[in-house]
Design a protein with these regions (language model features):
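Active-site residues of response regulator receiver
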Residues: 51
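Alpha2 helix of the CheY-like receiver
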Residues: 34-41, 64
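Conserved acidic carboxylate
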Residues: 7
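Two-component/phosphorelay signaling modules centered on CheY-like receiver
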Residues: 10-28, 42, 68
């Protein structure tokens, strides 16, 4: 399963990536909402984990944008 993780706190992001990879997930990590939106527009993911408060764009705004584009990827905020 391929996931996108958007978390602006690097240490937390690194820890979550390590846990997810240890459990056999493929993970791409980004550190702001704008990058999360760009990744979700450019590629197919099985799920996305979004931080609610991030630089450039918050998780709710990312979710609204991807839903407006018709992307129904499962999202955890």
């Amino acid at each position: 399963m391929r996931l996108l993780l958007a978390e602006d706190e690097r240490e937390l992001s690194d820890a979550l990536v390590a846990i997810l990879k240890h459990n056999n997930y493929s993970v791409d990590a980004v550190y702001n909402g704008e990058d999360a939106l760009n990744y979700l527009e450019a590629d197919n993911y099985d799920g996305a984990i979004l931080d609610i408060m991030m630089p450039k764009m918050d998780g709710i705004t990312v979710l609204k944008n991807i839903r407006a584009q018709g992307n129904d990827v499962p999202v955890l905020i």
